[in-house]
């Protein structure tokens, strides 16, 4: 209350920002007369002039008024659209690295061209991020004529894109693509073996469309590149047979004390817990089928993976619901995004959940994957020098944007006042009663001649409503994940008079519903339409448009409240675009998940005490407040979860930055001799300490063991006993130094047998191979540590501090292992000729190309890892199969083995980088 009073007196922060920006808008408008007098050639030459001024030291801020005026004039000439003043405010917001909240239909795509143009002048590249490939391609093609006119290049990145095309797209002044593709390209760039293979330039400036969807809804979404791990499909099928034998607790709260069931479910967090009785029953079954020994327990460390299978199976059967969280199509389990209602083909939950659902549905169980590289959207997008975004709904999450990304939200005023009427919610006792109320409302809206869009949270709800409308004889269209092929056609006509469209949350974010329908959709051949036909279609559309306006515009019906107010606002925002009339209302029931789980008993008891009939509704502020409080609780819980995840991921992110920085240094460094010699000192020193402890006397030394270990590890015998016999003064420190110097001298001798270029190439190859192999294993260890770290809380320890400490220890061990493997490989390997090195590199590139093709192909069938309790948060995962799959037919099989003369141990990793042992790859007989 106090903040409202103060705001009314001195104005809000948003008001002050708008006031400041309007002064800049005035400067842009002051340039309009002079800029509009320029010829096309003179207008085009302005870009080169701006670039020259920038190179000479002018800031982008100083260029803004004139550059925006140039972009607006070019848009007017090329696209036939002139930026409104509010769109210029939006452009300023984006340029300043803020989020522009702009209502649906206000022209976000056109607004963004201003900030894109200005920031492209720097020559460092601008990345425009969209939520799917269609929108990236659409926006690029819409704006390409404008940017071509202004002398800027435009590129689009997409999955399965040939490498040379992707490089060209990233070298363009402006690059369009999806958040997934940018993130995966970043990870792929940090898996290459030469700088020439990298695709991305340094990350400069980024504009994210629908930024709330990407940085809030998908913030907990890890981007994962993975390869196939061991197949355990038989175990999933076996565990699936246990679940029908288990009994769910009838009283979830009492169960923890009385154990009246085998497991209970935490619906709020979508997790399960198994009772002691349940553990005993599961163990008995596993012993019965031979999966568990007589004296073994599920609690034993070696059996924890089996326990994870059981937990995943229970979640699959009792938490994840068909046609709500996933659908089954052509024998495949496909995830449904609960935020958008879209299916996500190829994405898979991780931690065995997807395989458990496949076992439950009786379809083919696909193999699990192993993580090769990973990051999160939170950490990836924070790598940009400047980050901005736009959406229709961001203000409710302004605090999170500020605390996590240090970005402010500016609410951009609409060009015309909003004419949409948002009616009070109607609450019913039962879901069926709610559906009856919705159908009654649809009939009333149709009688007026207005179109209606019914938003549902799940596919199941959309199909239930569709069935009831069929029973009433009401013609309608259904837009959900099962009909996504018809999305464009359905959305195009959703604004026609009396049209009824049922849609899940996927209902075309990024696509406007035009009142009267889209007349252009009726043109079958755009290249051959006559002017008369076009005029006829426009006239017919105008008649329908006027009819819908007279009927009150598009009417929105929400079939239930989403857990997030932002998603509800997105649905409301489908109506009332650009000052059009419209109406919205939500219909709720006590059986809705949000009401059932979060609404207080007081609300439920009050409604039941009123004696309402099934299809009677109430509108009450207390109920509305209760719903808003419930949504606030969920949003707060989700914010805390994202914030908590970020704390953990920040620890992993620091390690990731160190590894990727080392990789870049390796790729860029021409001479690695000093680095390799330093590695020799570290590795030999550590090994010596195992047999000659620091500060020890000679009676404590194990010289025979040291000689054997050095010969075994490095294929080089050092006569240490002879040294000691011939020099009685050789103490522990002197002996240590003599061994290290001997090892370095041998390295130098072997290196002299090669040219400096050949030596650097071989050293770089082994160092990168070792680094990548151990980083992959480290990611798996970090993942396992993260899953169990919460248990430290029971020992009165801070899980986050424990994770930080242990992950650092693991990281130190990994760095030591990288050095050790590199020194071992270089000590053992046969000195290759130039021809052998060229053959080795050619084979690596050929394999990389094979892997890239499989990698890109599998991106369509990508793997989504469900890493959190909330099922609408899935981890992005490309099932790259980079390791075993790409080398199923190694070159050795046809006699082409570039490593044949290199004296490589058959159990050593293959030098080609496949991840297989040499005997299983190029050393295959």
Swiss-Prot record:
Q: Name one GO molecular function term.
A: protein-exporting ATPase activity
Give the location in the cell. Answer: Cell inner membrane; Cytoplasm
- Read off the lineage from the record: Bacteria, Pseudomonadati, Pseudomonadota, Gammaproteobacteria, Moraxellales
Record carries keyword Metal-binding: yes
Binding positions for ATP per the UniProt entry: 87, 105-109, 512
Protein task? Part of the Sec protein translocase complex. Interacts with the SecYEG preprotein conducting channel. Has a central role in coupling the hydrolysis of ATP to the transfer of proteins into and across the cell membrane, serving both as a receptor for the preprotein-SecB complex and as an ATP-driven molecular motor driving the stepwise translocation of polypeptide chains across the membrane.
Q: What is its main location?
A: membrane
Top-level taxon in the UniProt lineage: Bacteria
Name by which UniProt lists this protein: Protein translocase subunit SecA
Q: Which GO terms describe its biological process?
A: intracellular protein transmembrane transport; protein import; protein targeting; protein transport by the Sec complex
Cite the cofactor comment: May bind 1 zinc ion per subunit.
* Cofactor requirement: Zn(2+)
Q: Does the keyword Oxidoreductase apply?
A: no
The annotated subunit structure for this chain is: Monomer and homodimer. Part of the essential Sec protein translocation apparatus which comprises SecA, SecYEG and auxiliary proteins SecDF-YajC and YidC.
Q: Which is one Gene Ontology cellular component term of this protein?
A: plasma membrane
Species in which this protein is naturally found: Psychrobacter sp. (strain PRwf-1)
Q: Which HAMAP family does this chain map to? A: SecA (MF_01382)
Enzyme Commission code: 7.4.2.8
């Amino acid at each position: 209350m106090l903040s409202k009073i103060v705001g009314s007196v001195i104005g809000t922060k948003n008001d002050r920002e708008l006031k400041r920006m309007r002064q800049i808008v005035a400067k842009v408008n002051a340039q309009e007369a002079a800029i509009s007098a320029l010829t096309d050639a003179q207008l085009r030459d302005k870009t080169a002039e701006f670039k020259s001024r920038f190179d000479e030291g002018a800031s982008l801020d100083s260029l803004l008024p004139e550059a925006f005026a140039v972009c607006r004039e070019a848009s007017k000439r090329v696209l036939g659209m002139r930026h409104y003043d509010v769109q210029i405010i939006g452009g300023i917001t984006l340029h300043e690295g803020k989020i522009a909240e702009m209502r649906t239909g206000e022209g976000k795509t056109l607004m963004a061209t201003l900030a894109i143009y200005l920031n492209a002048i720097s020559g460092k590249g601008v990345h425009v991020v969209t939520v799917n490939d269609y929108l990236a391609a659409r926006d690029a093609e819409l704006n390409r004529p404008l940017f071509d006119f202004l002398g800027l290049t435009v590129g689009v990145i997409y999955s399965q894109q040939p490498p040379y095309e992707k490089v060209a797209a990233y070298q363009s002044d402006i690059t369009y693509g999806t958040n997934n593709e940018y993130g995966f390209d970043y990870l792929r760039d940090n898996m290459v073996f030469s700088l020439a293979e990298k695709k991305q330039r340094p990350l400069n400036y980024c504009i994210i469309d629908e930024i709330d969807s990407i940085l809030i809804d998908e913030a907990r979404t890890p981007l994962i590149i993975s390869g196939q791990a061991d197949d355990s499909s038989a175990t999933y099928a076996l565990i699936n047979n246990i679940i029908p034998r288990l009994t769910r607790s009838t009283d979830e709260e009492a169960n923890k004390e009385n154990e009246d069931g085998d497991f209970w479910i935490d619906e709020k967090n979508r997790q399960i817990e198994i009772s002691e009785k349940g553990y005993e029953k599961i163990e008995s079954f596993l012993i019965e089928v031979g999966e568990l020994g007589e004296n073994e327990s599920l609690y034993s460390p070696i059996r924890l993976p089996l326990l994870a299978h059981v937990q995943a199976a229970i979640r699959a059967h009792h938490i994840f619901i068909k046609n709500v969280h996933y659908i089954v199509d052509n024998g495949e389990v496909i995830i449904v995004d609960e935020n958008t209602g879209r299916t996500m083909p190829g994405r898979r939950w991780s931690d065995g959940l997807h395989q458990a659902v496949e076992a439950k549905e009786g379809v083919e169980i696909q193999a699990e994957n192993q993580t090769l590289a990973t990051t999160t959207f939170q950490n990836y997008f924070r790598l940009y020098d400047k980050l901005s975004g736009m959406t229709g709904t961001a203000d409710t999450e302004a605090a999170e944007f500020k605390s996590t990304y240090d970005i402010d939200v500016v609410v951009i005023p609409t060009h015309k006042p909003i004419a949409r009427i948002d009616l009070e919610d109607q609450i019913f006792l039962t879901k069926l009663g709610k559906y009856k109320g919705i159908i009654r409302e649809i009939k009333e809206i149709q009688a007026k001649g207005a179109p209606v869009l019914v938003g549902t949270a799940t596919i199941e709800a959309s199909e239930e409503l569709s069935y009831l409308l069929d029973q009433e004889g009401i013609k309608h269209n259904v837009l959900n994940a099962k009909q996504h092929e018809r999305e464009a056609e359905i959305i195009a006509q959703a604004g026609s008079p009396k049209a009824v469209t049922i849609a899940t949350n996927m209902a075309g974010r990024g696509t406007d519903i035009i009142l009267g329908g889209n007349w252009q959709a009726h043109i079958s051949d755009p290249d051959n339409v006559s002017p008369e036909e076009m005029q006829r279609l426009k006239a017919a559309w105008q008649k329908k448009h006027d009819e819908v306006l007279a009927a009150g515009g598009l009417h929105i019906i929400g079939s239930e409240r989403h857990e997030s107010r932002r998603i509800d606002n997105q649905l409301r925002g489908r109506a009332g675009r650009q000052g059009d009339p419209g109406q919205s209302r939500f219909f709720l029931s006590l059986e809705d998940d949000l009401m059932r789980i979060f609404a207080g008993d007081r609300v439920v008891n009050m409604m039941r005490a009123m004696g309402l009939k099934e299809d009677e509704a109430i509108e009450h502020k207390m109920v509305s407040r209760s719903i808003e409080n419930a949504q606030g609780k969920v949003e707060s819980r989700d914010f805390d979860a994202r914030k908590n995840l970020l704390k953990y991921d920040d620890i992993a992110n620091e390690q990731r930055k160190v590894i990727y920085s080392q990789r870049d240094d390796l790729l860029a460094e021409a001479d690695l001799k000093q680095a390799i010699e330093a590695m020799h000192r570290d590795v030999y020193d550590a090994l010596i300490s195992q047999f000659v402890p620091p500060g020890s006397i000679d009676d404590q030394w194990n010289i025979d063991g040291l000689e054997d270990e050095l010969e075994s590890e490095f294929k080089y015998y050092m006569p240490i006993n002879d040294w000691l016999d011939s020099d009685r003064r050789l103490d522990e420190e002197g002996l240590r130094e003599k061994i290290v110097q001997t090892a370095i001298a041998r390295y130098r001798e072997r290196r002299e047998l090669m040219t400096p270029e050949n030596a650097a190439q071989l050293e770089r190859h082994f160092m990168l191979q070792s680094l990548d192999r151990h980083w992959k294993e480290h990611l798996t260890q970090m993942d396992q540590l993260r899953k169990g770290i919460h248990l430290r809380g029971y020992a009165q320890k801070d899980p986050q501090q424990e994770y930080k400490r242990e992950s650092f220890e693991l990281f130190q061990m990994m760095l030591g292992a990288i050095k050790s493997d590199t020194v071992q490989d270089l000590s053992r390997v046969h000195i290759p000729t130039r021809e052998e090195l060229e053959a080795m590199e050619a084979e690596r590139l050929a394999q990389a190309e094979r892997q890239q093709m499989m990698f890109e192909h599998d991106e369509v069938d990508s793997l989504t890892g469900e890493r959190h309790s909330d099922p609408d948060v899935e981890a992005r995962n490309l099932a790259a199969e980079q390791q075993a799959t790409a080398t199923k037919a190694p070159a050795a099989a046809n006699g082409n083995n570039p490593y044949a003369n290199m004296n490589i141990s058959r159990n050593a990793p293959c030098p080609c980088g496949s991840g297989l042992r040499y005997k299983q790859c190029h050393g295959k007989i």
